[in-house]
Amino acid sequence: AAAMAFSFSTQQAQKYQCLPCGYDCDKEIHDKPGKCAHCQMDLVPVGSIKFKTIQPGQLCDYIKKHPNTVLLDVRTKEEFEGKADPNFGTLKKAINIPILDLEANLGSLAKLKNRDIIVFCSHSHRSPRASYLLSQNGFKQVTNMAGGMSVMPPGPCVQMK
């Protein structure tokens, strides 16, 4: 009788983490997809997050050292223009593509795929989703600003409208 050989492969169960919002829950690992109980961000597969995070207090210095950085404000047009209450201002030289329009505009942004891009919003709820969308679509150097404009200290890169 021929001997039967069995091979068992142990498949690692997929783990999930929340889209980085800049808070401690970013470090928590979950067993299934869903929403983060702390920040309500979507839970995505560990390893699928390919963007970095920068703290608001580091931003003006970073922009000064990297003047060709694309600053992408994903808030509404009203927020970007300072017509929303409260008005948190924006970053000088920022471009505005509201998150709801971002996916439809990926084609027109293709020329920026290899540029340094910092994505921000008001409270770091929309910008992590936008950063994830960009990084999943071939944008190589995407950074999310933690906390958003609501916690941005005054500085030479901030513009009140």
What do the predicted segments below correspond to?
Residues 1-3:
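N-terminal export leaders
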Residues 25-27:
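Extracellular adhesion/carbohydrate-binding repeat motifs centered on closely spaced tryptophans
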Residues 23, 123:
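Local cysteine-cluster metal-coordination motifs and their immediate loop/turn environment
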Residues 8-19, 30-65, 78-116, 125-161:
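Rhodanese-like catalytic fold shared by cysteine-dependent sulfurtransferases
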Residues 59, 70-75:
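Short hydrophobic beta-strand that contains or immediately precedes a catalytic carboxylate
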Residues 119-121:
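Short, surface-exposed ligand- or partner-binding patches at beta-edge/loop junctions that are enriched
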